[in-house]
């Protein structure tokens, strides 16, 4: 009998904590009311069967106009692959009950210099975010210019899921993810599996990192076997 009582009390406490978190959680990628600008830089390392070891950098700048609207621009360089990329994204944030939703439109351009190939990508997505997890759904249009020929793939489904060990309000966290996209690529059905972490020093500084494994067939790796990549970087917010 005592075991049943303790179980019921534990469930009630868990429900209460979850409800409180839903009320006070303010979104992982939202305007905090103070810092309108956000910049990040990260170092990328990896290896695949075609180009061997590779190294590169990502740069991002994000501006929050208010609690709803933001714009994000980024650049990517992977030196061994001779891959250069640029992207721009606009995002609208709104709340439905306890869910934070982010509707976004994005344009991405990648130039594979070694293979004389250009890639143009347009994406529309919506992301559902809670304190311990987030889900993304959308659609991508991917076009290639290869040696004078142009090819456009059919509309591709964008999907992703991410879950964290601790609530996002915590100063540190570890998570697991699977998705068919990353900072500078969108795939068909090739899923990117990985884990990530962050450590928030204060409201302005945050360190983050990821470790990913991708299967064969990825245009962005141009390989016939899996690729492993690691990423570590810093985010800085200011007024």
Where are these regions (language model features)?
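Cleavable N-terminal signal peptides
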Residues: 9-10, 20
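Short glycine/proline- and aromatic-enriched beta-strand/turn motifs that initiate or cap beta-hairpins
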Residues: 22-79, 237-239
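Residues that define the transmembrane beta-barrel architecture of outer-membrane proteins
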Residues: 35, 51-57, 82-86, 116-122, ...
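Repeated loop/turn-to-beta-strand initiation elements of outer-membrane beta-barrel proteins
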Residues: 37, 65-73, 96-103, 131-137, ...
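Residues on the lipid-exposed face of transmembrane beta-strands in outer-membrane beta-barrel proteins
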Residues: 43, 57-63, 88-94, 122-130, ...
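Transmembrane beta-strands of outer-membrane beta-barrel pores
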Residues: 43-49, 75-81, 94, 105-113, ...
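Predominantly the C-terminal beta-signal and adjacent terminal strand-loop region
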Residues: 187-239
């Amino acid at each position: 009998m005592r075991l049943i009582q303790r179980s019921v009390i534990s469930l009630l406490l868990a429900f209460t904590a979850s409800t409180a978190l839903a009320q006070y959680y303010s979104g992982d990628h939202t305007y905090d009311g103070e810092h309108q600008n956000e910049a990040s830089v990260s170092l990328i390392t990896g290896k695949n069967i075609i180009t061997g070891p590779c190294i590169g950098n990502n740069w991002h700048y994000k501006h929050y106009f208010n609690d709803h609207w933001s714009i994000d621009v980024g650049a990517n360089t992977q030196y061994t692959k001779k891959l250069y990329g640029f992207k721009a994204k606009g995002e609208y944030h709104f709340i439905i009950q306890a869910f934070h939703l982010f509707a976004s439109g994005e344009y991405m351009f990648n130039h594979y210099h070694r293979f004389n190939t250009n890639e143009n990508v347009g994406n529309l997505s919506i992301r559902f975010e809670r304190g311990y997890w987030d889900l993304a759904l959308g659609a991508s249009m991917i076009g290639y210019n290869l040696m004078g020929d142009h090819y456009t793939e059919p509309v591709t489904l964008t999907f992703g899921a991410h879950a964290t060990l601790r609530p996002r309000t915590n100063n540190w966290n570890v998570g697991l993810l699977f998705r068919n996209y990353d900072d500078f690529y969108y795939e068909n059905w090739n899923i990117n599996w990985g884990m990530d972490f962050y450590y928030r020093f204060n409201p302005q500084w945050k360190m983050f990192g990821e470790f990913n494994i991708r299967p064969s067939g990825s245009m962005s790796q141009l390989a016939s076997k899996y690729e492993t990549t690691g990423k570590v970087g810093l985010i800085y917010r200011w007024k």
